Amino acid sequence: MRTPAQFLGILLLWFPGIKCDIKMTQSPSSMYASLGERVTITCKASQDINSYLSWFQQKPGKSPKTLIYRANRLVDGVPSRFSGSGSGQDYSLTISSLEYEDMGIYYCLQYDEFP
């Protein structure tokens, strides 16, 4: 009979490309900006995430809204003032000319690896 530790060892052999947990660091943590200003938010992954990154906007009392997927692809209906860029570990979201309706919480999500 195999012990759980031996079983885990077998499972890991089946997934040779398995990665460690990926830590995402977003900056700045908060910011103030004026209307019409260019704003950039960055997100850094602890390892290469192969551009599997989305950016979301959330307003108080509302569900998150996807703005960008695959690092730089704009979701249909999202204004063109939003853009995403980056590769490997470093990514950014830029709002070219800030509008009042852009006020909210922004965050990134990697989906190269799930917990």
From Swiss-Prot:
Disulfide bonds join C43-C108. Residues 109-115 are annotated as: Complementarity-determining-3. GO terms for biological process: adaptive immune response; immune response. Residues 77-108 are annotated as: Framework-3. Pfam families: V-set. Residues 21-43 are annotated as: Framework-1. Residues 1-20 form the signal peptide. One of its GO terms (cellular component) is immunoglobulin complex. InterPro entries: Ig-like_dom, Ig-like_dom_sf, Ig-like_fold, Ig_sub, Ig_V-set, IgV_Light_Chain. Residues 70-76 are annotated as: Complementarity-determining-2. Gene3D superfamilies: Immunoglobulins. The keyword Protease does not apply. Keywords: Adaptive immunity, Disulfide bond, Immunity, Immunoglobulin, Signal. Residues 44-54 are annotated as: Complementarity-determining-1. Residues 55-69 are annotated as: Framework-2. SUPFAM superfamilies: Immunoglobulin. This is Ig kappa chain V-V region L6. The lineage of its organism: Eukaryota, Metazoa, Chordata, Craniata, Vertebrata.
